[in-house]
Structures are given as structure tokens and as C-alpha cells.
From Swiss-Prot:
Its main location: cytoplasm. Homodimer. Its EC number is 1.1.1.290. It comes from Escherichia fergusonii (strain ATCC 35469 / DSM 13698 / CCUG 18766 / IAM 14443 / JCM 21226 / LMG 7866 / NBRC 102419 / NCTC 12128 / CDC 0568-73). Pfam families: 2-Hacid_dh, 2-Hacid_dh_C, DUF3410. It catalyses: 4-phospho-D-erythronate + NAD(+) = (R)-3-hydroxy-2-oxo-4-phosphooxybutanoate + NADH + H(+). It is found in: Cytoplasm. The gene is pdxB. Catalyzes the oxidation of erythronate-4-phosphate to 3-hydroxy-2-oxo-4-phosphonooxybutanoate. Belongs to the D-isomer specific 2-hydroxyacid dehydrogenase family. PdxB subfamily. This is Erythronate-4-phosphate dehydrogenase.
Length: 378
């Protein structure tokens, strides 16, 4: 049994070698010749999986170690009798922590408290729900918009997008990319929406590049609209609008979900799905794969305020480390993908062990996802 895996999927060789012969290959472009005798294909979002790639090939199963699936033609796979699995929620925590790192940086730079801001969350799936929970744990007001969930009657106080635009100081997008249909998200943030944002608002896109109309956004910024922008995703990736990058406050190369934990979850989820597909079901404990974190433990004295939270968050991950490298190589062919391929190891907040002498600080840090304990000062 031959299994092709994206060369940037951590732990893929280690896990899939339990099931057969493993060949690691580039994801963009994928070497088509390798598909001629392969039984399974494990990809990331950079690989377009469709009829033109797989027609006439012996592939029986496709797995994507990503939450999103807009790069996969699921309907064609089903029609062709090819098994499929994604990894929903695998990088949700990573994306939430990316958003927090960005917001805390902007709050420090511009001198505002997040408690004074209302956050509008567009898309309330695995990422949106977790973001809502962590923001509300801090006492930050949130507004939710998710028309598909609202129409299904899912639990939640869902508002219209117009309401979020009118009332939110921060608007952050966490939707799939739907190019048509009743829940179309292509250019959901169009020129009209962008121009309607509150003066000084913050716009964040960490889902799919085309959810925000990049051309319209650049036009508004060039005209002097007072707006802070965080973009992790771009229309036309791996190409991007260099002029837009110059205008945004934070720009990164589609790495919001790139924690070691998130990547490992993606790999293990598709590994477990494929092992079940072939009748050799196996389960993997994530902590048996992950290395020890860089920081063993730290001690926190007193209450948890915003500056202290910012220091803790940026101790684990400061978004500026990914902004600067992209600006240096923007516009150079191949460099966007190279940054992603050679991405420095990044951990989640849970890797940081925090000893607190204040019980409320320990409790709040646990709600936020840190590994915190209370030890009263002696």
C-alpha cells in the first residue's frame, strides 16, 4: 500500500508508515507521476483535489489535514467512489490565539482596552465559538453572525451582518469560502461593507482570502479610511497584492492555524480516519507526539490585567514575528510558500505552565486555554 503525504504534514511519516509505504511529496505543485501507483493521498489546503488531478488514478482515499475543504471537490470524490476525510477544528485554537495576539498588539500600540470594544464574529463554527468563549471569559462583548446556523435554529443570539458592521469595533471573519448559493461568502466584505465600518474599526481575516475583496479594501485604505487591518489570507494566494500588504497593520502568509498542536491534530485526525477506512482502526494520543515546550513554567503574581495577558500571549506567540518576514519577500515568486514550508515551530497557550498566587487569575487563565494552577504565596 502506497500513501502519498504532503511533505509539510508533521508526524505524517511516523504515523502513516504504520499502515503502508509512505512517500512525502510537495503539495504545490503535487508531482502527478507519483499518483500512478498510490492508494491514498494526504494533502493540505495548497493542493487542489479534483477530477483533473485524480481521474484515472488508483487513489482510493483522500485526506486533508485542514479544517477547510474548499480546495477539494467532494462531490466528484463521492461520485468516483473515493473515500474522504477532513480535520474539522484541528487548527481552531491556533487561529483564535492568532487573533488574540494581533488584538493585544494593536491595543498596546493604540492605547485602548479590549473591554471598551465590541467584537463582531462572522462565522461561528469551530473557530468562532472558541473565540467567543475566550473573549467573553475576559468580559469582552461579542456579536455573532452566522446565517446558516441561524436558519437551522442553532443555539445562539445571531445578528445580521449589517448589525455587526453598525455596532462592532472589531470585525473578524471565520467562514468557509462559498462562491455562490444562498450563503455566498465570496467578497462578503465588499466595498460597501468596508466603507460602512465604524471609524477606527479593526478588520481581521483569518479564514479565506476571497472573503474580503482585496481590491476594494486597498481602494478604501488608499483613500484614507481610518481602519486597522489584519490579514493572514489573501486573494490569489500564493500571489498577493503587495500594495495592500504595505497598507495593512499586520500581514502574514496564511499561518494563523500553524501551531504544532494544530498541525499534529490535523495529521492524527486524517490518520485515524484512513486507518478506519482500511479496516485497521487506530487512535493516537496527541501528547505522545509533541515535544516538551520551550518554557517549563513561569510564576504570575497578582491579578490578570490586559498588559500581563499580552506579555503571556506574546511569550508563546507574537504575531509580529510572522509579519516582518512576509514584508521582506513580498512579490518574490515562491517566497510566500517558502515561508509556510519553513515555518518556525509555534506552540499553543496550553504549552505554558503558569503558577498563580491569585486564584481568580489561575481560573481565568484556565478558561483562556493556559495550563495554570493556583499556589497561594507563602
Amino acid at each position: 500500500m502506497k500513501i502519498l503525504v504532503d511533505e509539510n504534514m508533521p508526524y505524517a511519516r511516523e504515523l502513516f508508515s504504520r499502515l503502508g509505504e509512505v512517500k512525502a511529496v510537495p503539495g504545490r505543485p503535487i508531482p502527478v507521476a507519483q499518483l500512478a501507483d498510490a492508494d491514498a493521498l494526504m494533502v493540505r489546503s495548497v493542493t487542489k483535489v479534483n477530477e483533473s488531478l485524480l481521474a484515472g488514478k488508483p487513489i482510493k482515499f483522500v485526506g486533508t489535514a485542514t479544517a477547510g475543504t474548499d480546495h477539494v471537490d467532494e462531490a466528484w470524490l463521492k461520485q468516483a467512489g473515493i473515500g474522504f476525510s477532513a480535520a474539522p477544528g484541528c487548527n481552531a485554537i491556533a487561529v483564535v490565539e492568532y487573533v488574540f495576539s494581533s488584538l493585544l498588539m494593536l491595543a498596546e500600540r493604540d492605547g485602548f482596552s479590549l473591554h471598551e470594544r465590541t467584537v463582531g464574529i462572522v462565522g461561528v463554527g469551530n473557530v468562532g465559538r472558541r473565540l467567543q468563549a475566550r473573549l467573553e471569559a475576559l468580559g469582552i462583548k461579542t456579536l455573532l453572525c452566522d446565517p446558516p446556523r441561524a436558519d437551522r435554529g442553532d443555539e445562539g443570539d445571531f445578528r445580521s451582518l449589517d448589525e455587526l458592521v453598525q455596532h462592532a469595533d472589531i470585525l473578524t471573519f471565520h467562514t468557509p469560502l462559498f462562491k455562490d448559493g444562498p450563503y455566498k461568502t465570496l467578497h462578503l466584505a465588499d466595498e460597501k461593507l468596508i466603507r460602512s465600518l465604524k471609524p477606527g474599526a479593526i478588520l481581521i481575516n483569518a479564514c479565506r482570502g476571497a472573503v474580503v475583496d482585496n481590491t476594494a479594501l486597498l481602494t478604501c485604505l488608499n483613500e484614507g479610511q481610518k481602519l486597522s487591518v489584519v490579514l493572514d489570507v489573501w486573494e490569489g494566494e500564493p500571489e498577493l497584492n503587495v500594495e495592500l500588504l504595505k497598507k495593512v497593520d499586520i500581514g502574514t502568509p496564511h499561518i494563523a492555524g500553524y501551531t504544532l498542536e494544530g498541525k499534529a491534530r490535523g495529521t492524527t485526525q486524517v490518520f485515524e480516519a484512513y486507518s478506519k477506512f482500511i479496516g485497521h482502526e487506530q487512535h493516537v494520543a496527541l501528547d505522545t507526539l509533541l515535544p516538551a515546550p520551550e518554557f517549563g513554567r513561569i510564576t504570575l503574581h497578582g491579578l490578570l490585567d490586559q498588559p500581563t495577558l499580552k506579555r503571556l500571549v506574546h511569550l508563546v506567540y507574537d504575531v509580529r514575528r510572522d509579519d516582518a518576514p512576509l514584508r521582506k519577500v513580498a512579490g518574490i515568486p515562491g517566497e510566500f510558500d517558502k515561508l509556510r514550508k519553513n515555518y518556525l515551530e509555534r506552540r499553543e497557550w496550553s504549552s505554558l505552565y503558569v503558577i498563580c498566587d491569585d486564584a481568580s487569575a489561575a481560573s481565568l487563565l484556565c478558561k483562556l486555554g493556559f495550563n495554570a494552577v493556583h499556589h497561594p504565596a507563602r
